[in-house]
Regions:
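Flexible cytoplasmic loops linking transmembrane helices in multi-pass membrane transporters
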Residues: 2-25, 186, 233-298, 477
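Cytoplasmic helix-loop-helix junction between adjacent transmembrane helices
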Residues: 127-153
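Central mid-sequence intracellular linker of multi-pass
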Residues: 179-251, 443-476
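Loop-to-transmembrane helix entry/capping segments in MFS-fold secondary transporters
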Residues: 58, 144-153, 302-303, 403-412
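Glycine-rich segments within core transmembrane alpha-helices of 12-TM secondary carriers
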Residues: 146-199, 411-424
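Loop-to-transmembrane helix entry
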Residues: 55-67, 294-315, 408
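Cytosolic juxtamembrane N-terminal segment immediately preceding the first transmembrane helix
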Residues: 1-55
Length: 477
């Protein structure tokens, strides 16, 4: 079915006017953004910090490190069963309940292994559910000119949560009085998680806008039209609303009447493979090996006496915001290609410098300067990955799949992400990890993927969801 013509605007709206006109679209994902923030807090606690537990067994720390990833994978599989079938309220209320329970466990037993493990699993499950629902909702409610900015809330608020956790922990220990605090640091974490969960539930109740596509699938045409009018900032029926309604019908009819296998093979298999590779490369920047390498380099290079990973998290926030501002202006493919090439180059250089350090450590006179160079290269690597690879992959995830298979394909991508994170963590724990070889490998992979992305990734900037879907199933021009 051919795409409908796009009505042209008489004048280009400024960014401020775009925020004002489409403010309800940002409000529609405010609850999901709060859950992403809570997920960042837990990811920062479990991976970028050393989990605090009263058990002396090393296996306890290892399990706490990977538990959140297991929970995210389980939550995404659970979400694939009901997302785009029922109201988004179910996902948000489930996520809220899981977060509150996880926070209570942290408050009641802040150093007990079983309590902390259950909390990580519950909060990971909450994030997994919300990640699938949030990406689907953001893609469906967003105007095509701001879809990238709207979907980018996933990465921005995840990194903000990580940054908040690391900065709060640093301040907590740097300002600790001689007689200590009445609260344990894990209890503070639990209180913050509960507050964010309650805020997310309040936002969901206050700004409840269902996806017009879901309403159309449920044959609630009047409700769908009303929601479209609100979200598009149109006080009366206009060509833009008519076009949006017809686009929803096209998306619903695209894979109607086909078997799951046929839909998967015909329209979703190739986009799924592309996004798996892109997303897994992007998730390495949050992995335990990258974190541990930065800690080692920063202790020597920056003379850090306390965990300085918050500096890496600030780079993640900066890169994510930069990517969000560029993705709808310069295109998804362009920033993905550039960031893959530059991040791959930075990783390759880090591998070379680390190899030189470990081979010639006895002859290097200024070791701290060499490690300092590794730190700065890692800052650049983090910014490039967050601004381009992670951002573009998030936006592509909202555009690449058909309606019937979107939640399942997103769950497959998320599960593979978490499997990669767990694998890298276990390798670091139980294998003689070769840091130079690791960075050499991801450097080569990044540069090769950058070249391939130029030819095999479509450019979907300023396209409707239906146009993006069609574009993804053709060789890009």
């Amino acid at each position: 079915m051919p795409s409908l013509p796009t009505p042209e605007k008489k004048g280009k709206l400024s960014r401020l006017r775009i925020f004002c006109r489409y403010r309800l679209q940002f409000q529609a994902i405010s609850s999901a953004s709060a859950f992403f923030l809570a997920g960042g807090l837990k990811l920062g606690w479990s991976v970028l910090e050393r989990p605090t537990v009263n058990s002396q067994k090393l296996i306890a720390t290892h399990l706490l490190t990977i538990a959140w990833f297991v929970g995210v994978a389980a939550g995404s599989v659970l979400a694939s069963a009901f997302v785009q079938r029922v109201s988004k309220n179910l996902a948000h209320y489930l996520s809220g309940v899981f977060l509150v329970l996880g926070g209570i466990l942290f408050i009641c037993a802040p150093t007990t292994f079983a309590s902390l493990l259950c909390s990580c699993l519950l909060e990971g499950c909450a994030y997994g559910i919300n990640q699938i629902q949030g990406i689907v909702t953001a893609g469906e409610v967003a105007h095509k000119h701001i879809r990238g900015l709207l979907v980018s809330s996933e990465r921005i608020f995840l990194w903000l949560g990580i940054c908040l956790q690391l900065l709060c922990t640093r301040l907590w220990f740097s300002m600790e009085p001689d007689n200590g605090y009445a609260l344990h640091v894990n209890q503070l974490h639990g209180f913050v998680v509960i507050l964010i969960a309650l805020a997310a539930l309040v936002l969901n109740i206050t700004y409840h806008f269902e996806s017009p596509l879901l309403l159309q699938m449920q044959q609630r045409d009047l409700a769908a039209t009303y929601v479209m009018k609100c979200l598009q900032g149109a006080p009366y029926p206009c060509l833009e609303i008519v076009q949006k309604r017809e686009e929803c019908k096209q998306l619903v009819e695209y894979d109607a009447g086909q078997t799951v296998w046929m839909v998967m093979r015909k329209s979703n298999a190739l986009p799924l493979l592309k996004l798996l590779l892109l997303r897994c490369y992007g998730t390495i920047s949050l992995s335990l090996p990258v974190n541990r390498t930065f800690i080692t380099a920063s202790v020597t290079g920056l003379k850090c006496t306390i965990n300085c990973v918050y500096l890496l998290a600030i780079c993640g926030v900066f890169g994510s915001i930069l990517g969000a501002l560029c993705v709808d202006k310069y295109g998804r493919r362009n920033i993905a290609v550039i960031s893959l090439l530059f991040s791959g180059t930075c990783a390759f250089l880090m591998g070379g410098i680390l190899h030189y350090i470990y081979e010639q450590i006895s002859t290097i006179l200024l070791t701290h300067l060499t490690f300092e160079l590794v730190v700065y290269l890692m800052f650049c690597y983090q910014i490039f990955v967050c601004a381009g690879v992670s951002m573009a992959s998030s936006v592509y995830m909202s555009e690449a799949f058909t309606v019937a298979m979107k939640a399942k394909c997103l769950a497959a991508v998320v599960v593979c992400e978490q499997a990669l994170q767990i694998t890298l963590a276990l390798i670091l724990f139980y294998v003689d990890f070769n840091e130079p070889l690791f960075f050499f490998f991801i450097g080569v992979v990044g540069m090769v993927m950058g070249i391939l992305a130029l030819f095999f990734l479509p450019e979907t900037m300023c396209m409707s969801l239906y146009e993006s879907l069609v574009k993804f199933n053709k060789v890009p021009s």
